[in-house]
Amino acid sequence: MDHRYISICGMTEKELLANFKEGINELAEANGDTEEATIAKLKARYDGYHFEENTVGIYNPFSVLNTLAKSRYDDYWFKANTHTFLFDILKKHDYCITEFSKAQIKANMMNNVDFNPFLDIYLSGYLTIKSYDERFKNYQLGIPNKEIEEGILNILQPLFKQN
């Protein structure tokens, strides 16, 4: 990805704080939290997307805006999507949900979804870049935040138990 566009699909914490101070304070008041605690909760639930190594985290704007508008935390992005795509990939390749924290992709394969199904999962927003090994040119992927982690566990786990 071109470094100039790493935050095009979301917002940085700096942008969040600069543009949504009033909404953050209203959310804090509605939930009986301090502003600092509210920012920490927003970060844990909706931040964590990285589209390139060693970059600032990107917040999911859909979930942040819904949280601020409704003054309550929820899995807005996860609930707004159908997850059959993810379920089908995991089933087809016999992946376990726990493998998400061990997913790796070679840098030269970042544009080749046929080679590694985890790339498709990453491109769909369920995984993000956690680290990069310069020596081996290898990306370590992982679940970006609590919204995705809880969504995967709450929605997909029962599907796997049924099959």
How would you name each of these model-derived features?
Residues 1-163:
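Phosphate-binding site recognition
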